[in-house]
Amino acid sequence: MKALYMVFVLWVLIGCFLSGECHRAPRGQHGPRRTLAPSTHHRHYHLYPLPDPNHVQFGVPPFLPTSSGFCKPHSLSLYAPPFEIVIQPSSIIVTIPGLILTLSSDPSPQRNCPARTPPRVKANIIPGPITAQLLPKLKIPLIILDDSRK
């Protein structure tokens, strides 16, 4: 969970530093009607179309493949140029152009998808006569406190 917070904080900080709010002229040189000299314009070349910088898109950018071939259909993708954060149930993938950081708890992805989801099991079942008979077969220790000795 700490890794998720670190990725989110990193994403927010990088987004703040790359936004137009952080690129300001030195004090006393701000003129809203004055145009910048051509030598101060920065040209950025991108290999993919840039969306609106003030809008965060949910989904996969058009230049990335939409299917990884693994059985992880439920994933969340946050895309703010030029960064993409893909959050999947068992891994977090952060893609930055020129740098790839992958944090994964499952080193081998699941290749065989189950046909259906396993049935849900209730966690608050009070042991009754049937459950008490099954406990010795399941090799689960059963502790019984006897308060009759006083």
Curated annotation (Swiss-Prot):
<protein>
    <recommendedName>
        <fullName>Submaxillary gland androgen-regulated protein 2, isoform alpha</fullName>
    </recommendedName>
</protein>
<feature type="signal peptide">
    <location>
        <begin position="1"/>
        <end position="22"/>
    </location>
</feature>
<dbReference type="Pfam" id="PF15621">
    <property type="entry name" value="PROL5-SMR"/>
</dbReference>
<dbReference type="GO" id="GO:0009636">
    <property type="term" value="P:response to toxic substance"/>
</dbReference>
<keyword id="KW-0732">Signal</keyword>
<dbReference type="GO" id="GO:0005576">
    <property type="term" value="C:extracellular region"/>
</dbReference>
<keyword id="KW-0964">Secreted</keyword>
<dbReference type="InterPro" id="IPR026288">
    <property type="entry name" value="SMR-like"/>
</dbReference>
<keyword id="KW-0216">Detoxification</keyword>
<comment type="function">
    <text>May play a role in protection or detoxification.</text>
</comment>
